[in-house]
Regions:
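Selected alpha-helical membrane-embedding segments in polytopic membrane proteins
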Residues: 21, 34-156
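Low-complexity, intrinsically disordered extramembrane tails and loops of integral membrane proteins
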Residues: 1-19
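Coil-to-alpha-helix initiation sites in intrinsically disordered, low-complexity, charged segments
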Residues: 16-27, 96, 192-193
């Protein structure tokens, strides 16, 4: 009787203090299960987001001077000529300047667009898991998304290193600069739909998805099998939408050239 009473009143061991941002970054790479449990217990957003943004702008600073914007404008001019052969050289030159200017501005705003994407991802994931009986808060979901994004940070660092080594990069071929997905096996102009589809099966994207599954299971208190079903279903929907847009663009280009 006394042993039972002693056991019921035994003090619980205190939880370890939460890891800092850099410990968590290392943890999601080498010990994701325990790290995402720590993130779910005490999520953080500001420091990892700022760190990713700083790295993103360093990459942008190094990449922008190496972007071959002429290749982008030439491709657009080719499409415009096919649709409007009567356009003058002055008009085409104006389109070329606008295209290059827009590309440069968009490139500098790219890291900031990432914030919007992370917020959308966190909101969609939280809604999906709550609808399927899971738990969690928006802060937990956003923190999970940010730390799951680390493989993509590594990817952009690798892309930047390759770009610096090459000297010039065609922005329209960014997804195949690093041969981490099978899209490089097909020609983007001849098979745009297949190119778009294959580009989704990137090693770094799959790595991110695995981390998302582990992290979402931790904050939502669901099984990893259920988390995998939800995350992969949402990913499949995104692939379908992206492929549909590629198909519409390809059909539009086909109409222009016929």
């Amino acid at each position: 009787m006394s042993e039972t009473a002693d056991a019921s009143h035994s003090p619980t061991l205190p939880l370890p203090p939460p890891k800092n941002t850099f410990q968590r970054i290392a943890g999601v790479l080498f010990a994701p299960a325990s790290t995402f449990e720590d993130i779910a217990r005490k999520p953080d957003v500001l420091v990892p987001m700022l760190l990713i943004l700083v790295i993103g702008y360093i990459n942008t600073f190094l990449m922008m001077p190496r972007m071959d914007w002429n290749a982008v404008s030439e491709a657009q001019i080719e499409a415009i000529k096919a649709k409007n052969p009567q356009m003058t050289d002055a008009d085409l030159e104006r389109v070329s300047r606008m295209t290059q200017a827009f590309g440069k501005v968009a490139g500098w705003f790219g890291p900031l667009f990432g914030i919007v994407w992370w917020l959308i991802m966190a909101g969609v994931l939280l809604l999906a898991f709550r609808l399927m009986g899971g738990q969690g808060t928006f802060k937990q979901a956003l923190s999970t998304v940010l730390y799951s994004w680390i493989p993509m940070v590594i990817y952009y660092i690798v892309v930047t290193i390759v770009a610096v080594g090459r000297g010039k990069i065609d922005p329209t071929h960014m997804v195949t600069v690093v041969k981490s997905n099978p899209a490089f096996l097909v020609d983007m102009k001849e098979q745009p739909i297949l190119f778009s589809l294959l580009s989704n099966f990137d090693v770094f994207t799959i790595w991110m998805l695995v981390l998302l599954i582990i992290g979402c299971a931790a904050f939502s208190k669901t099984s990893r099998a259920k988390a995998a079903a939800i995350v992969l279903s949402l990913w499949a929907v995104m692939i379908l939408i992206k492929t549909a847009f590629a198909a519409m663009a390809a059909a539009k280009m086909k109409v222009k050239t016929t």
